[in-house]
């Protein structure tokens, strides 16, 4: 099926979730975003695409009674981060006063050739009190909010190990004179988490109240060192999604971490799901807060043999079956169990982020997706450089509403 011409937008409680948007229509890359090949130096493709996407999202949020000015969180995926500065110039046009918190990373190809970025936005309903806060943590000289409180939810911008003066600061680097003493990924992770501690304390909360994490690693071989530090900060860890990315916005940065927390008064319920495979790493399968359930990114693994046997193609019959369909079905069946344990159901999903190692697997993924979702929730699909289980093709990250 071709990409939807209009964003899918769903309200859940006080929040409004939109599908990730690229600059495409039913004919491919939208004509009004193209640079005339006869005049290749006149105009900016990234600026045109950014405007096109934000105009579409403006209309979509208006249908739910919200506007871009009510957006509180953005995930932005660029196929080439050298486009970031021009993108941010347009971002300032659309968010002149209170920009949303933002996480920006490099990603692989989009679903439509020629599309340079994907924008994923979440908004708050206009009648809900929103408080923007600042912190003493280092901040980049670009257009985003450090933190926004919406009811009991605390949204923060993604953080890298940077002081935004020298790049990666000395305290987050291994001394080049002593290259075998210490770990860059551990130092960067610790630096980031220390700054997040400052961020959430400024909101009157703490790391203890984090309810969801997205982690973007440039090299997945760094995961184990990162996870060791993660355990120091999270004795009781939140749900987490971890994917590989080709690039980050700070030179030599190895990881970007993106967190959502809640206020101390909000009740958090960790969800135990005994009938799905127990993860090897340090995260919870799901967590319920108020009327939302946040699930960890799910992979097609039993955490014993790698790719789960029932998700594999029999090597003796390599042309019988589809690996991407098998993995997608395996993951969604486990997410059915996860949401059931939380007291809700898969059909109440209000937001999905899907990470594919090969964007050409999208068609097979979508066939199975539509078996489970005749009407798809808002969905963002991005190409990652890798996942944490060898030979896994897909990771699925879902948020569901309570009945």
Segments (PLM) and residue ranges:
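N-terminal presequence-like segments and the immediate start of the first folded domain
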Residues: 1-55, 59-73, 77-194, 198-212, ...
């Amino acid at each position: 099926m071709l990409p939807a011409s209009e964003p899918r937008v769903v309200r859940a409680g006080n929040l409004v979730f939109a599908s990730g948007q690229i600059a495409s229509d039913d004919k491919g890359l939208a004509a009004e975003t193209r640079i005339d090949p006869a005049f290749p130096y006149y105009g900016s493709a990234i600026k045109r695409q950014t405007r096109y996407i934000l105009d579409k999202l403006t209309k979509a949020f208006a249908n739910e009674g919200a506007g871009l000015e009510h957006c509180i969180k953005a995930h932005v995926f660029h196929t080439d981060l050298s486009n970031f500065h021009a993108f941010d110039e347009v971002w300032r046009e659309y968010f002149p006063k209170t920009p949303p918190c933002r996480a920006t990373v490099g990603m692989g190809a989009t679903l439509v050739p020629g599309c340079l970025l994907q924008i994923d936005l979440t908004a708050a309903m206009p009648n809900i009190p929103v408080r923007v806060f600042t912190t003493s943590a280092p901040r980049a000289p670009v257009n985003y909010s450090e933190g926004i409180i919406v009811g009991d939810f605390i949204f923060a911008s993604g953080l890298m190990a940077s002081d935004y003066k020298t790049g990666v600061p000395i305290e987050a680097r291994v001394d080049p004179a002593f290259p075998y003493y210490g770990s860059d990924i551990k130092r960067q992770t610790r630096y980031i988490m220390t700054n997040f501690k400052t961020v959430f304390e400024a909101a009157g909360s703490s790391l203890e109240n984090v309810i969801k994490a997205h982690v973007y690693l440039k090299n997945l071989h760094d995961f184990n060192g990162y996870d060791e530090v993660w355990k120091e900060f999270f004795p009781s860890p939140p749900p987490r999604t971890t994917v590989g990315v080709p690039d980050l916005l700070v030179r030599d940065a190895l990881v970007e971490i993106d967190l959502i927390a809640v206020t101390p008064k909000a009740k958090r319920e960790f969800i135990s799901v005994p009938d799905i495979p127990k993860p090897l790493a340090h995260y919870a399968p799901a967590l319920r807060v108020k009327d939302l359930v946040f699930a960890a990114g799910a992979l097609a693994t039993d955490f014993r043999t790698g790719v789960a046997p029932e998700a594999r193609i029999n090597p003796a019959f390599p042309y019988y079956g589809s690996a991407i369909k098998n993995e997608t079905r395996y993951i969604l069946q486990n997410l059915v169990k996860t949401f059931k344990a939380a007291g809700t159901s898969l059909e109440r999903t209000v937001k999905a982020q899907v990470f594919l190692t090969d964007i050409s697997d999208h068609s097979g993924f979508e066939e199975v997706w539509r078996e489970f979702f005749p009407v798809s929730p808002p969905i963002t699909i991005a190409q990652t450089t890798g996942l944490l289980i060898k030979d896994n093709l897909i990771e699925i990250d879902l948020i569901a509403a309570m009945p």
